[in-house]
């Protein structure tokens, strides 16, 4: 029986190997059901969050962050974050950038809802530690010709929400009477007074920043009779009016000034679309003592006496105000003086705004 004799050892070996494999499998199952097996690979430590010292918020960029026509973010990006790795934040419109000094920034999106949603997502993300951060809300804006001019840069003393309240059509009212009434229940978030000590520091550090101007802006200013509208750009301060509606015309401008006074705020000098909403988001997590609003005026909030409001809103080619490129650079020039000072003097600033 040579055939049966030659196959018997092979069958025995296969049977033995199968038994050993089954035993090993059962042992592995028992180990997984009982005490976990010890891993030979140590778990990677969690990344330490970035300690944010100053967060710069812009609302839009025209194209890329560098190398093309600059919007609100590009000059900041080129100064602080050209070598930074973007931090993608779920829920935010664009990435956050941070440098080694703790200066961070992002484009949040235009309008109250858009910008507030991005700011909330950024504040809640564990990659960033805002426990001692200062905030600079920046961008372009409009100004009444009686209070400012093209190229101006303004620090906000008060942020007032233009939208919250009751409003009705002028034809349903006594001629010349206000068409706005505040609504009860909005008192805690319809206006914010920003820290006067911080505004004072901002003005002290930036008041003499060199301002850029353009021939087109200088010529455009002469269309307005007001002395404030005709002067060269400067650094100032006052109430920033936040409204989702791009309100326009002397009547709406007068109403904005009326609301500012109704709320006990300073003169309305800037119209913008985000700051009060962003401030409310920050307030609920960190308070308002370290918030700054910085805006550059790129248009007047009304036409000159020789044009209608609609003509001013939709100008013919070559009839625009000019000065946009210079203004977005002015905003960064003014703001960097405060950012750089806070970072350089961080031991004095980390616990709060120091005495001057």
Annotate the PLM regions.
Residues 31-356:
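Accessory terminal and edge-of-domain segments that mediate assembly/interaction
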Residues 27-28:
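C-terminal motif of bacterial Sec signal peptides marking the signal peptidase cleavage site
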Residues 3-20:
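Bacterial N-terminal signal peptides that target proteins for export
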């Amino acid at each position: 029986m040579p055939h049966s004799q030659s196959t018997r050892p092979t069958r025995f070996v296969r049977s033995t190997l199968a038994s050993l494999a089954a035993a090993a499998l059962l042992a592995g199952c028992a180990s997984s059901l009982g005490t976990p097996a010890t891993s030979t690979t140590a778990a990677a430590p969690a990344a330490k969050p970035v300690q944010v010292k100053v967060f710069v918020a812009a609302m839009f960029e025209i194209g890329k962050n560098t190398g093309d026509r600059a919007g609100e973010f590009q000059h900041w990006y080129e100064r602080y974050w050209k070598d930074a790795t973007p931090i993608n934040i779920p829920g935010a419109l664009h990435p956050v950038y941070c440098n080694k000094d703790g200066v961070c920034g992002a484009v949040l999106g235009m309008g109250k809802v858009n910008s507030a949603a991005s700011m909330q997502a950024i504040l809640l993300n564990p990659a960033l530690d805002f426990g001692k951060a200062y905030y600079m809300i920046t961008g372009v804006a409009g100004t009444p010709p009686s209070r400012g001019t093209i190229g101006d840069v303004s620090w906000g003393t008060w942020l007032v929400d233009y939208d919250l309240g009751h409003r009705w059509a002028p034809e349903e009212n006594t001629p010349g009477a206000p068409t706005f009434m505040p609504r009860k229940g909005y008192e805690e978030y319809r206006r914010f007074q920003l820290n006067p000590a911080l505004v004072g520091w901002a003005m002290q550090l930036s008041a003499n920043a060199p301002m850029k101007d353009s021939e087109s802006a200088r010529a455009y200013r002469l269309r307005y009779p007001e002395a404030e509208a005709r002067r060269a750009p400067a650094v100032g301060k006052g109430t920033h009016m936040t409204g989702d509606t791009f309100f326009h015309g002397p009547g709406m401008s007068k109403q904005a000034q009326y609301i500012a006074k109704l709320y006990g705020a300073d003169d309305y000098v800037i119209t913008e679309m985000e700051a009060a909403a962003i401030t409310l988001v920050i307030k609920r997590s960190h308070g308002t003592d370290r918030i700054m609003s910085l805006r550059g005026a790129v248009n007047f909030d009304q036409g000159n006496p020789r044009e209608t409001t609609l003509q001013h809103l939709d100008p013919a080619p070559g009839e625009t105000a000019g000065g946009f490129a210079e203004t977005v650079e002015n905003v960064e020039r003014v703001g960097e003086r405060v950012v750089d000072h806070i970072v350089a003097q961080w031991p004095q600033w980390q616990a709060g705004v120091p005495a001057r």
